[in-house]
From Swiss-Prot:
Listed Gene3D superfamilies: 1.10.150.910, YVTN repeat-like/Quinoprotein amine dehydrogenase
Species for this entry: Homo sapiens
Name of the protein described by the UniProt record: Splicing factor 3B subunit 3
Gene this chain is encoded by: SF3B3
Classification lineage: Eukaryota, Metazoa, Chordata, Craniata, Vertebrata
Domain notes: The core of the protein consists of three beta-propeller domains.
Localization, UniProt: Nucleus
Length: 1217
């Protein structure tokens, strides 16, 4: 079995975010890392929408990311620390839209190791040096400079190693143009290591150490070190030189401290806490991330606590000495992994879990009544300030980036009866959790819908003048009339536009600079800017059946297949070409391309005929109306559309932006198929045809503009958009009802919209999330969803949600009541009334936990619910709250053989589980009966068990439960479940159970899979095979009777299969002593499974399912990852395909090595050597290679570049999208 890996949706969780001017213009951009992906985002300063400019897979783990700018430069570079053992400096090239590797210096081994640098990066604020550090011991400093040609150069590394030292954080200190300096949070563990009593370990202190790079001596010295009172978790650089006092802020538990050299005394200020917080009062508070904003006149920091509260931190200085730190509560946003304050006044928040946000900073919070806390205020040691959290006041949300991270569970099923299956994804954490329903398609925003007086058959938009940015008229054609609407604040009917209203319209367009043309069945109407009208009438009884128009040309087909060609002369007159062209059959459809910039005319006309052919006809004056080429079609054409697509933006000498792309002829057939063919711009030849089936209706094609490039809207029983995005073609359905006719639409409110008609309504639509594979509907949940099952009859979902360190609703209410009573009791006689009012206000206050976070209850505190949900409407039908410290871990829906048709839900619950050191007071299996057509849970009984029931699976009319490391068969009893049989020989802890026939495949938390056979006659569970590798299995899926696919905690996917000679018939041993099964092999079962395939995905996979994703497609193995990625593994159907892709992968490894310097083969073989899998993500980078490299690779494969990319597209569309 050979598989091909494809990513459908890249990881969405963000681990690092940096900002700067990466394209060299004044625009602010953000570079984010999503595990093994680098992405460049550009927030539009006018609309606030975030656009993705570039996404690159780096095939390595990005461990740190920094931006720097050389002194006097205008462009930021990116320095990346990864697991490749190399430091890499990247530059973004806007002309090619790619990251270019400028420098790659090797310094150590690959892999994420504790003493190989890469975990921490720090840059001197003036861009003169960069320090790259390991978690332990090693630190290297590289000096950055320019050569004579102003190119960036990098020195050889200077060492600043110190053995037995752990590093917690590193920053560059802003010292102006003095020798560059770096500050590190370190801890020396040498004494603690050598002291057997453990006393030294208890007294070990963290130190703040400054390293100075002496540029004169080219040497790094350890300048200064001092022990810290509290344990710091990160450092913030304070602007220095002429901008500020320099030094660092140390964020530690409960305090923030300012430190600098010389006579500067330490300034420390406690971190304020929420008033009346339900959190455990003993729990400390830390800052988790920060962002700095610096202008010429001032600077401030925004720092966020682990509850999500952002504080604005300012420093008061007196002659370069800091005198106090001031903190002011700013706003509360979800807890971030990284924050960036952009110069354009935006705050980008990359959330730890869930969606990411872009906020506009509306106020700086200087002049509001929020109290300001200062280090100068007198406080007892151990006391702190209190503030009241509130909804957003200084920030305004302007954009939200959908993120599925973390996906904890996923099932694929067509519960909504839509032909195409939906993905039901449980994601998020705590109160920000959600169940999301993903459908393949682009999200459509409806801008306006208006009723029309009848059912129109076509719609167009035209501009008044070629220089206009926006459209002026919408023209709607009916069976016997034409309606003209003007576009302004509102859309109104106009009568003086010059259009003929008493006839249907075939087409209309802007002609030349400022004239309009209307083609109707009896003639052509040319309307000048001063409302003069020229008409051309059809001869005799002939009428116009089809037409094609652009800015300078009009072609019409008369009845009988006669073509008449008009072209505009320099004076703005429409002139008919002297000859007419008779076609051999009736014309069904025609298309002209737009006139290329700087040219007089479009050279080609495409004509589709009844005889199932499409012909390209020249419009060049030298051979006008001469046929150039022809293509036979499998069915009759319905519509044609010539577009220029896939171009990269180029700037010419005058700075004019234009794009150089390829001409494509799109052909929509009457049988619902779309063909895309390359049209040669010189000869007019047609080549390289791609085919896609779109739906059951004939395909109509319309040209629209998306992100400044031409795109094609194709309408069949579903509407599809064909567009080029990041050097790849996308053909994506729109998640919207069926449309009949459309045209591009540009107005002030909606610069790149679509106007469309559907029955008797006119709709204005916008597509904002180009490049998105899925559109999603999210239903909020209360705690982190762990697993869910689908009830087969009602299609409802039964979800278990569990959170550690959390209170149940009942405990929360109880704690609040208790705190309110304490408030009243603590008050003196005269303050009683005031205290009572405060207590009442506190009880009534209800801040949404999805924004403000849930209170942290402490270790060993659990909260759980069981929810029954309708997945289509997303409404909760039933909710069962479990008691405090009961944690639901497993769920199953099953029927018992002795109870007939009733469905039961079993939920495995742990009681008082403490994770570290692990202890558990036992567990229960709750049994519920599904009543009321699967909408309500009726509690039957709970069965006590001695360990955590982490896996439940129905089995032959009974149920299998993994209780800790015991595998048991239970049956339903009146008062509880009855134990029928057990096996005690599983190694550690059962994390999953799959069943097929008499076989049970058990996943162990550390020891991979164990195959068990149930013998009915002797009522025994007997282990007959296991795996030879230890695998920390997270999820498994059965592929057939002998084969199982599994994933582990470290990001690997494997497929293991029992060899054909495996014997599970224990009864057949004639001697009766069952010797084979008792013998054992390699400390395990007597028979071993074989590994069919191994592959390192690079993200922890938490669900696997064998399914088909598109109607009529083939089966594939779909996986989802913790970081929000969705991918598939698809089998090759032929040897030659496998051979071809193996060679593509081999050539790309050498011709197009990964961006961060990691070896592709060793990345995919991180834990186990990669076996029988070809990496489609690498193969698809073929499309983004430079054309000459593409040519070299395809010549090695005896193909042309279009043939190679066609193969890549075909394998993708056969299984997915």
């Amino acid at each position: 079995m050979f598989l091909y890996n494809l990513t459908l949706q890249r990881a969405t969780g963000i681990s690092f975010a940096i900002h700067g001017n990466f394209s060299g213009t004044k625009q602010q951009e953000i570079v984010v890392s999503r595990g093994k992906i680098l992405e460049l985002l550009r927030p539009d300063p006018n609309t606030g929408k975030v656009h993705t400019l570039l996404t690159v897979e780096v095939f390595g783990v990005i461990r740190s990311l920094m931006a720097f700018r050389l002194t006097g430069g205008t462009k930021d570079y990116i320095v990346v620390g990864s697991d490749s053992g190399r430091i890499v400096i990247l530059e973004y090239q806007p002309s090619k839209n790619m990251f270019e590797k400028i420098h790659q210096e090797t310094f150590g081994k690959s892999g994420c190791r504790r003493i190989v640098p890469g975990q921490f990066l720090a840059v001197d604020p003036k861009g003169r040096a960069v320090m790259i550090s390991a978690i332990e011991k090693q630190k290297l400093v590289y000096i950055l400079n320019r050569d004579a040609a102003a190119r960036l150069t990098i020195s050889s590394p200077l060492e600043a190693h110190k053995a037995n030292t752990l590093v917690y954080h590193v920053v560059g200190v802003d010292v102006g143009f003095e020798n560059p300096m770096f500050a590190c949070l370190e801890m020396d563990y040498e004494e603690a290591d050598n002291d057997p009593t453990g006393e030294a370990a208890a007294n070990t202190q963290q130190t703040l150490t400054f390293y100075e790079l002496d540029l004169g001596l080219n040497h790094v010295v350890r300048k200064y070190s001092e022990p810290l009172e509290e344990h710091g978790n990160f450092l913030i650089t304070v602007p220095g030189g002429s901008d500020g006092p320099s030094g660092v802020l140390i964020c530690s538990e409960n305090y923030i401290t300012y430190k600098n050299f010389g006579d500067q005394p330490d300034i420390r200020c406690p971190i304020p806490r929420r008033r009346n917080d339900l959190d455990d009062p003993e729990r400390g508070m830390i800052f988790v991330c920060s962002a700095t904003h610096k202008t010429k006149s001032m600077f401030f920091f925004l720092a966020q606590t682990e509850q999500g509260d952002i504080f604005k931190i300012t420093l008061e200085t007196d002659e370069d000495m800091v005198t106090e730190i001031r903190l002011k509560y700013f706003d509360t946003v979800p807890v971030a992994a990284a924050m960036c304050v952009l110069k354009t006044g935006f705050l980008f928040v990359a959330s730890e879990f869930g969606n990411h946000y872009l906020y506009q900073i509306a106020h700086l919070g200087d002049d509001d009544e929020e109290p300001e806390f200062s280090s100068a205020m007198p406080l007892e040691e151990g006391d702190t300030f209190f503030f009241q959290p509130r909804p957003l006041k200084n920030l305004v949300l302007v954009d939200e980036l959908d993120s599925l991270s973390p996906i904890l569970f996923c099932q694929i099923a067509d519960l909504a009866n839509e032909d195409t299956p939906q993905l039901y994804v449980a994601c998020g954490r705590g109160p920000r959790s959600s169940l999301r329903v993903l459908r393949h398609g682009l999200e459509v925003s409806e801008m306006a819908v208006s009723e029309l007086p009848g059912n129109p058959n076509a719609v167009w938009t035209v501009r008044r003048h070629i220089e206009d940015e926006f459209d002026a008229y919408i023209i709607v054609s009916f069976v016997n009339a034409t309606l003209v609407l003007s576009i302004g604040e509102t859309v109104e009917e106009v009568t003086d536009s010059g259009f003929l209203g008493t006839t249907p319209t075939l087409s209309c367009s802007l002609l030349g600079d400022d004239a309009l043309v209307q083609v109707y069945p009896d003639g052509i109407r040319h309307i000048r800017a001063d409302k003069r009208v020229n008409e051309w009438k059809t001869p005799g009884k002939k009428t116009i059946v089809k037409c094609a128009v652009n800015q300078r040309q009009v072609v019409i087909a008369l009845t009988g297949g006669e073509l008449v060609y008009f072209e505009m002369d320099p004076s703005g007159q429409l002139n008919e070409y002297t000859e007419r062209k008779e076609m051999s059959a009736d014309v069904v459809c025609m298309s002209l391309a737009n006139v290329p910039p700087g040219e007089q005319r479009s050279r080609f006309l495409a004509v589709g005929l009844v005889d199932n052919t499409v012909r390209i006809i020249s419009l060049d004056p030298s051979d006008c109306l001469q046929p150039l080429s022809m293509q036979a079609l499998p069915a009759q054409p319905e519509s044609l559309c010539i577009v220029e697509m896939g171009g990269t933006e180029k700037q010419d000498e005058l700075g004019e932006r234009g794009s150089i792309g390829f001409l494509y002829l799109n052909i929509g057939l009457q049988n619902g198929v779309l063909l895309r063919t390359v049209l040669d711009p010189v000869t007019g030849d047609l080549s390289d045809t791609r085919t896609r089936y779109l739906g059951s209706r004939p395909v109509k094609l319309f040209r629209v503009r998306m992100q400044g490039q031409e795109a094609v809207l194709a309408m069949s029983s579903r509407s599809w958009l064909s567009y080029s995005y990041q050097s790849r073609f996308h053909l994506t359905p729109l998640s919207y009802e069926t449309l009949e006719f459309a045209s591009g639409f540009a107005s002030e409110q909606c610069p790149e919209g679509i106007v469309a008609i559907s029955t008797n309504t006119l709709r204005i639509l916008a597509l904002e999330k180009l490049g998105a594979v899925f559109n999603q509907v999210a239903f909020p949940l209360q705690y982190t969803p762990r697993k869910f099952v689908i009830h087969p009859e009602s299609n409802n979902l039964i979800i278990i949600e569990t959170d550690h360190n959390a209170y149940t609703e009942a405990t929360k209410a109880q704690r609040k009541q208790q705190m309110a009573e304490e408030m009243v009791e603590a008050a003196g006689e005269d303050e009683r009334e005031l205290a009572a009012e405060m207590a009442a206000a506190f009880l009534n206050e209800n801040l949404p936990e999805s924004i403000f976070g849930a209170p942290k209850a402490g270790n060993g505190q659990w909260a759980s619910v069981i929810r029954v949900m309708n997945p289509i409407q997303g409404n909760t039908l039933d909710l069962v709250q479990l008691e405090q410290n009961e944690a639901a871990f497993s769920v199953a829906v099953c029927r018992f053989s002795n109870t007939g048709e009733d469905w039961y839900v079993l939920v495995g619950v742990a009681k008082d589980l403490i994770l570290n050191p692990r202890s558990v007071a036992g567990g229960f299996v709750y049994t519920y009966k599904l009543v009321n057509n699967g909408e309500k849970l009726e509690f039957l009984h709970k069965t006590p068990v001695e360990e955590v029931p982490a896996a439940i699976a129905p089995f032959q009319g009974r149920v299998l439960i993994g209780v800790g490391k015991l595998l048991r068969v239970y049956d339903l009893g009146k008062k509880k479940l009855l134990r029928k049989c057990e096996n005690k020989h599983i190694a550690n802890y059962i994390s999953g159970i799959q069943t097929i026939g008499h076989r049970v495949i058990v996943s162990d938390v550390q020891e991979s899979f164990i195959w068990v056979r149930y013998k009915r006659n002797e009522n025994q569970l007997i282990i007959f095979a296991d795996d030879t590798y230890p695998r920390w299995v997270t999820t498994a899926s059965l592929l057939d009777y002998d084969t199982v696919a599994g994933a582990d905690k470290f990001g690997n996917i494997c497929v293991v299969r029992l060899p054909p000679n495996t014997n599970d018939e224990v009864d057949e041993d004639p001697t009766g002593n069952k010797a084979l099964w008792d013998r054992g092999l390699l400390n395990g079962a007597s028979q071993k499974a074989e590994v069919i395939m191994n592959y390192h995905v690079g993200e922890t996979v938490l669900s696997l399912q064998k399914t088909t994703l598109i109607p009529g497609g083939s089966e594939s193995l779909v996986y989802t990852t913790l970081s929000g990625g969705i991918g598939i593994l698809v089998p090759f159907t032929s040897h030659e395909d496998h051979d071809f892709f193996q060679h593509v992968e081999m050539h790309l490894r050498s011709e197009h090595p990964p961006l961060c310097g990691r070896d592709h083969l060793s990345f995919r073989s991180y834990y186990f050597p990669v076996k029988n899998v070809i990496d489609g993500d690498l193969c698809e980078q073929f499309n983004s290679m430079e054309p000459n490299k593409q040519k070299n690779v395809s010549e090695e494969l005896d193909r042309t570049p279009p043939e190679v990319s066609k193969k890549l597209e075909d394998i993708r569309t056969r299984y997915a999208f």
